[in-house]
Each structure stands twice: as C-alpha cells, then as structure tokens.
Amino acid sequence: MNWSFYTLILGFCIDLLLGDPHGFPHPVVLIGKLIDALGRLFRALLPKTKSGEIAAGALLWVFTAAVSTAIPALLLIFAQKISVWLRLALESIMCWQILATKSLRDESMKVYAALQTGSLSDAQRAVSMIVGRDTERLDEKGVARAAVETVAENTSDGVIAPLLFLAIGGAPLGFFYKAVNTMDSMLGYTEPPYKNIGLVPAKMDDFFNFLPARLSAFFLLAAGFFLRLDVKNGWRIFRRDRYKHASPNSAQTESVCAGLLGLRLAGDAWYHGVLHKKEFIGDAVREIEYADIPHTCRLMELAAILALIVCCAVKACFIF
C-alpha cells in the first residue's frame, strides 16, 4: 500500500495544528550541523582556491543530499518491518517536520504583533528571525514589507515545494528537498566566505525550485481568486516582474502577492553590511499596512490547502 498518500495528509494537518513547538527536536537542525561539519572538513581537505572551494561545495552538496535522503528512507524500512502502523506514524511525523505552514504564520504574526504595540525594536528583532537582511536599518513600513516578502517567498520554499516533493516521493524525498533548501540558506551568498563554496548549493536550489516556484505562483493566484483579491493585477504583475530577482525563482510568488495586494515590494536591501541594489516588484497602488502581514498569511495558507488537494487528487488517480 502507498502510505505516503495518508502520511501526507496527516503530516499537513499536524503541521497546521502544532507548527514547530519550542524545544521539540527538529531534523533541519541536524541537517544544518551536518552542512557545517562537512563544510569545515572539505575546506580543510581541498586547496584554498576558487576551484577548490567550488569543489568543496559540490562534495558537500552530494554528501548532505545523500545522507538526508538515506537516513529517513532506512528508518521507514525498519519501521515497516516492525509494524505498518509504526511506519504510518513515523512518516506522518516526518512530513509534519518537513512542512512549515504554521511556523511561517506564527513567526510573521510576531512581527505584526510587535508593530501593533508600536515597538520598532521588537518588530525588527522579530523580523530578523525570518529574513536574512540587516533589519536594524528598517523603519515600520520596511519591517512590514520584509515580513510580507518572506511569507510570499517562503510560500514556495517552506510550504508548497516540500509538499510537492512529499507527494512524489514521501518523506525521504521531502528531506532531500529540505537539505537542498537548507544548504542554499546557509551557503548561497554572493559575499565571502560563501561565494565559492556556496555556488553549487545555490545553483542546485535554483534547479530543484524551478517548477515548484511557478506552481506555487499559480496556487497563490487561485487562492487570491477565492479571497476575492485582484487576480487580474496579480497575473499582470506576475508576468511583468517574476524575474526581477537575482534568483530565477524568488520573485515568482513575490510578484503574485504584490499584484494581488496592490503593493510595491523588494527594492534595495542591506545584507551583512553591504547594500544590494534590487528592482522593485509590483506597483504601489497603495501604501503597505501592518494588516498586509496577516493578509499574506491567509493567502499562503489557502494556497497550501489548494496544493494539498491537487496533490492528493493526483496521487489518488494512481493509487485507487
């Protein structure tokens, strides 16, 4: 029996209910430690040259992806030998830990709550937990914009893309995706010391997110339709601005959200003390408001539910 059909649904529901409880062990933390250890190892073994660092990044990517896929696969095989119900429970827990729907909402709503109280420093601190830019330079609108942007972008990376990988290959493929995404998050920067070692992880992340990012954009458009937002403008901005980002994937969902909400997102941002020039995404039909954070969360959640329905419908065609 194809248990991944049921574990996908169970894992999704558990994620909506529990999110990431504080203090609960998370496999992504272990993946991060593996990346850090392998990075130090391969950098020590290979020449301190551009080609040596690129090779270190390539080896790191292969080993991390392989280990992150093999361990959950072996655990599920052993669980199956003991009991199919143990396999069902274990894979459901794995699926839950791969998805990030509730945690993305919870963390972004902390930013919203801080803005509502009028504490800019608290809002900057809260948004620094979910974005990579230098948040101490942001004013209230900049903080709100950063929160909206990260929810929009992570609708693909944190929710729909892992959901698609889970639907195709169960928890092992889901963890493969999380490893790919985590390597890019930790190493995929254009500044030293990550520029060379992060090249392969960044390119592989672009490759594996190419289709999920575009599918996520369409799920967001569908969610916008059900929420009675400006889908026509969402489609227009998507077609116009979806490549206005250094990554070929990041602006796919961001452009849809900008169009649906009538906002202008992106623009110049500081990272690690360096100003990065970026194009704007969307048109400033209106000024951004604090309430746009929960609005974007609702878009993300409905898009995730629609993606789950489609994934389950497709899987059902092959199972039943």
Residue positions per predicted region:
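Hydrophobic alpha-helical transmembrane segments
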Residues: 1-176, 180, 188-320
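Glycine-rich phosphate/dinucleotide-binding loop and adjoining beta-alpha-beta core of small-molecule
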Residues: 185
